[in-house]
Amino acid sequence: MTNIRKSHPLIKIINHSFIDLPTPSNISSWWNFGSLLGICLILQILTGLFLAMHYTPDTTTAFSSVAHICRDVNYGWIIRYTHANGASMFFICLFIHVGRGLYYGSYTFLETWNIGTIFLLTLMATAFMGYVLPWGQMSFWGATVITNLLSAIPYIGTDLVEWIWGGFSVDKATLTRFFAFHFILPFIILALAITHLLFLHETGSNNPSGIPSNMDKIPFHPYYTIKDILGALLLILALLTLVLFSPDLLGDPDNYTPANPLSTPPHIKPEWYFLFAYAILRSIPNKLGGVLALAFSILILLIVPSLHTSKQRSMMFRPLSQCVFWLLVADLLTLTWIGGQPVEHPFIIIGQLASILYFSLILVLMPLAGIIENNLLKW
């Protein structure tokens, strides 16, 4: 009798994806973050579903409905803070996952990489719209500032902004549509994640050496299921520590003030995971230029595969490229710090230098390091 997991049409798909999947024997803990992203996504969908049962997308009641969730709903506070901090965990895992892809040359799997980039963009849109929903001061002004950026588009900009707003300012129509999109987008993200996995399993996983590992593969279960469970436990431990001890650590105090269109907060800033892009946006004095730099700071990931000049896939044996990579990490941390600072000296010039360095590292220094290393191999 054949095993049901190998013969049943549905279970067979799960078997080929998570049980009998041939996996390189040498993949490190940096490969754990894919499964952690899956856990984050499921967690966000579940907590979001329960929040949506009690939330009202109306400008007059949105703020008080969030307060009601935290005060009156059974364990509402833990659901709300798990959802808010779960987003932070999601982005931490995602940034590490992308960084791993850059370091070990996983971007040579073109379809997987491109779908991953679309995943990132969709997730950023979802998180932005979710931040607007509590209808606090930072929600309202963040929505106003970020949507207003589209007015920099020539000819159609102003009409486009008013079309997105559903009126002449961020108001009830905006909140309602943001709630609708925030609810539906995670399911689109789920579909993207499945497609991402589908393309990955066509080629098989990369590994730290960047060398094809077809001659040395092991089944995913039990080796990597155990490894992923350990990663998941550490993720949940970190998330629960954040939620139970300092749930507002990554939030903004301004968001505990109800939205007031007549009073602008002293420093308008997005959530921490957007600060690097926000710093790039602010570093360019021209509005259209800033918007283009902001878009390109993420879309640049799509052209990374065509900038690969090295004969080796991974950076494991490429010290020059490693230096450039870690310089990029340090630069992104600097941009994140600058994005949260007021627009004044010396932060303006630091932000401008960090922005120039960001694009220079990816567009010039990384390909250059690859060419130099190729020449060093000849010696």
From Swiss-Prot:
<feature type="binding site" description="axial binding residue">
    <location>
        <position position="196"/>
    </location>
    <ligand>
        <name>heme b b566</name>
    </ligand>
</feature>
<dbReference type="InterPro" id="IPR005797">
    <property type="entry name" value="Cyt_b/b6_N"/>
</dbReference>
<keyword id="KW-0479">Metal-binding</keyword>
<feature type="transmembrane region" description="Helical">
    <location>
        <begin position="320"/>
        <end position="340"/>
    </location>
</feature>
<keyword id="KW-0408">Iron</keyword>
<keyword id="KW-0999">Mitochondrion inner membrane</keyword>
<keyword id="KW-1133">Transmembrane helix</keyword>
<keyword id="KW-0349">Heme</keyword>
<dbReference type="InterPro" id="IPR030689">
    <property type="entry name" value="Cytochrome_b"/>
</dbReference>
<feature type="transmembrane region" description="Helical">
    <location>
        <begin position="33"/>
        <end position="53"/>
    </location>
</feature>
<dbReference type="InterPro" id="IPR048259">
    <property type="entry name" value="Cytochrome_b_N_euk/bac"/>
</dbReference>
<keyword id="KW-0249">Electron transport</keyword>
<protein>
    <recommendedName>
        <fullName>Cytochrome b</fullName>
    </recommendedName>
</protein>
<keyword id="KW-0496">Mitochondrion</keyword>
<feature type="binding site" description="axial binding residue">
    <location>
        <position position="182"/>
    </location>
    <ligand>
        <name>heme b b562</name>
    </ligand>
</feature>
<dbReference type="InterPro" id="IPR027387">
    <property type="entry name" value="Cytb/b6-like_sf"/>
</dbReference>
<dbReference type="InterPro" id="IPR005798">
    <property type="entry name" value="Cyt_b/b6_C"/>
</dbReference>
<keyword id="KW-0472">Membrane</keyword>
<dbReference type="Pfam" id="PF00033">
    <property type="entry name" value="Cytochrome_B"/>
</dbReference>
<dbReference type="InterPro" id="IPR036150">
    <property type="entry name" value="Cyt_b/b6_C_sf"/>
</dbReference>
<feature type="binding site">
    <location>
        <position position="201"/>
    </location>
    <ligand>
        <name>a ubiquinone</name>
    </ligand>
</feature>
<feature type="transmembrane region" description="Helical">
    <location>
        <begin position="113"/>
        <end position="133"/>
    </location>
</feature>
<dbReference type="InterPro" id="IPR048260">
    <property type="entry name" value="Cytochrome_b_C_euk/bac"/>
</dbReference>
<feature type="binding site" description="axial binding residue">
    <location>
        <position position="97"/>
    </location>
    <ligand>
        <name>heme b b566</name>
    </ligand>
</feature>
<keyword id="KW-0679">Respiratory chain</keyword>
<dbReference type="GO" id="GO:0005743">
    <property type="term" value="C:mitochondrial inner membrane"/>
</dbReference>
<keyword id="KW-0813">Transport</keyword>
<feature type="transmembrane region" description="Helical">
    <location>
        <begin position="77"/>
        <end position="98"/>
    </location>
</feature>
<comment type="subunit">
    <text>The cytochrome bc1 complex contains 11 subunits: 3 respiratory subunits (MT-CYB, CYC1 and UQCRFS1), 2 core proteins (UQCRC1 and UQCRC2) and 6 low-molecular weight proteins (UQCRH/QCR6, UQCRB/QCR7, UQCRQ/QCR8, UQCR10/QCR9, UQCR11/QCR10 and a cleavage product of UQCRFS1). This cytochrome bc1 complex then forms a dimer.</text>
</comment>
<feature type="transmembrane region" description="Helical">
    <location>
        <begin position="226"/>
        <end position="246"/>
    </location>
</feature>
<dbReference type="GO" id="GO:0045275">
    <property type="term" value="C:respiratory chain complex III"/>
</dbReference>
<dbReference type="InterPro" id="IPR016174">
    <property type="entry name" value="Di-haem_cyt_TM"/>
</dbReference>
<dbReference type="GO" id="GO:0008121">
    <property type="term" value="F:ubiquinol-cytochrome-c reductase activity"/>
</dbReference>
<dbReference type="Pfam" id="PF00032">
    <property type="entry name" value="Cytochrom_B_C"/>
</dbReference>
<keyword id="KW-0812">Transmembrane</keyword>
<keyword id="KW-0830">Ubiquinone</keyword>
<dbReference type="GO" id="GO:0046872">
    <property type="term" value="F:metal ion binding"/>
</dbReference>
<feature type="transmembrane region" description="Helical">
    <location>
        <begin position="347"/>
        <end position="367"/>
    </location>
</feature>
<feature type="transmembrane region" description="Helical">
    <location>
        <begin position="178"/>
        <end position="198"/>
    </location>
</feature>
<dbReference type="GO" id="GO:0006122">
    <property type="term" value="P:mitochondrial electron transport, ubiquinol to cytochrome c"/>
</dbReference>
<comment type="function">
    <text>Component of the ubiquinol-cytochrome c reductase complex (complex III or cytochrome b-c1 complex) that is part of the mitochondrial respiratory chain. The b-c1 complex mediates electron transfer from ubiquinol to cytochrome c. Contributes to the generation of a proton gradient across the mitochondrial membrane that is then used for ATP synthesis.</text>
</comment>
<comment type="similarity">
    <text>Belongs to the cytochrome b family.</text>
</comment>
